[in-house]
C-alpha cells in the first residue's frame, strides 16, 4: 500500500524523470505500472545488491518501461560524487529508504552518510538513521 500511495502522489505532478534511490526488487517500479505511469518517463534506480538490481531491471523491461537506468551501486556515494553536477536533476522521487542505525552501517556507508550531511551543510550526529541521508540526498537532486 505504501508504494502505491507514494507513487500515485508523485505521479500526480506528472514528472518526466523519477529517482528511486533504493529500489530493491522493484516494489515501487511495480507501483509505477499499477498507477498507469507513462512508459517513457526517465527512471533512475539504485540498489546495492546485484541480484535485487537485476530483478528491478527485468521488471522494468517486462512492464514495458523503455527509458530507465538501474545502477548496482551505493546511492549515497553516487550522490556525494554528483552533488555539484548541475545537469543531474529529477522531478520526482519514489521509494522507501533503508532504516538502519548509523552504528550498524559499515564504515564505508558511515562515511558516505556523513559526507551527505557535510555537503549539504547539515549538522550530523552518529545518532542519525540511514533514511535521513537518503532523504536529504534525494531532495538535493530535485
Residue ranges and their predicted role:
Residues 1-142:
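SAM-dependent methyltransferase catalytic region
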Amino acid at each position: 500500500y505504501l508504494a502505491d500511495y507514494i507513487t500515485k502522489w508523485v505521479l500526480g505532478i506528472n514528472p518526466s524523470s523519477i529517482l528511486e534511490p533504493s529500489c530493491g526488487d522493484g516494489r515501487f517500479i511495480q507501483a509505477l505500472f499499477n498507477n498507469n505511469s507513462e512508459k517513457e518517463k526517465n527512471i533512475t534506480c539504485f540498489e546495492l545488491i546485484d541480484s535485487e538490481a537485476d530483478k528491478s531491471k527485468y521488471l522494468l523491461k517486462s512492464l514495458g518501461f523503455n527509458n530507465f537506468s538501474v545502477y548496482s551501486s551505493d546511492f549515497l556515494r553516487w550522490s556525494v560524487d554528483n552533488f555539484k553536477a548541475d545537469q543531474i536533476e529529477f522531478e520526482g522521487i519514489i521509494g522507501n529508504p533503508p532504516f538502519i542505525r548509523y552504528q550498524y552501517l559499515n564504515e564505508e556507508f558511515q562515511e558516505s552518510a556523513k559526507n551527505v550531511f557535510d555537503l549539504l551543510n547539515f549538522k550530523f550526529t552518529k545518532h542519525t538513521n540511514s533514511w535521513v541521508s537518503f532523504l536529504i540526498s534525494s531532495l538535493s537532486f530535485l
